[in-house]
């Protein structure tokens, strides 16, 4: 039996990412975002949704760029902490002992400890209500060599223990149960 609930955003799990921003080291910040995802494959575009009162909101709006840094089980404490502490009060890179790194295309820092860093340039900002959506072009992706299969050179991100968010909690992924298209594969005879 199913129950009716009030309308809400119940699409879980979501990636729990750290978004980094700032052009100058003095304004570098990172904050936790779960409202993020892919918008388009070609051209590659993604989004983050941010409350206007967040410290990083003005930094991103001013510089029109940010980096989406995927997080891992090892980064879980920092991921939570950066979501409940403000960059107005703390230098989060120092507090969490995470390393700001240089991006290839954007001026915002990436997080060296992240297995995958997605460099983004803001294309449009849409005011939606509690959050504004920053729609962005993906201008570069930096992948950690440790997550590349040495034989195929394919990215094996599941091996990095990515962190996901489910309605108030952080989790790792479970076992792989199939691959894209496996439901229609022809059986080998």
List each model region and its residues.
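Basic, polyanion-binding surface patches
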Residues: 1-189
């Amino acid at each position: 039996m199913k129950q009716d609930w009030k309308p809400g955003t119940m699409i879980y799990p979501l990636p729990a990412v750290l978004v980094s921003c700032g052009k100058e080291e003095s304004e570098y910040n990172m904050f936790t975002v779960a409202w993020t995802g892919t918008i388009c494959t070609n051209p590659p575009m993604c989004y983050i949704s941010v409350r206007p009162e967040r410290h990083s909101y003005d930094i991103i709006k001013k510089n029109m760029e940010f980096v989406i840094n995927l997080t891992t089980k090892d980064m879980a404490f920092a991921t939570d902490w950066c979501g409940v502490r403000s960059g107005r009060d703390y230098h989060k890179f120092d507090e969490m002992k995470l390393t700001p790194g240089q991006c290839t295309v954007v001026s915002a820092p990436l997080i060296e400890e992240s297995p995958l860093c997605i460099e983004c340039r803001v294309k449009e900002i849409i005011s939606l209500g509690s959050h504004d959506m920053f729609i962005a072009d993906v201008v570069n992706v930096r992948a950690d060599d440790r997550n590349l299969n040495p034989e195929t050179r394919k990215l094996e991100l599941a091996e990095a223990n990515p962190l996901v968010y489910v309605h108030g909690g952080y989790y790792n992924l479970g076992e792989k149960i199939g691959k894209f298209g496996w439901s229609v594969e022809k059986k080998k005879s």
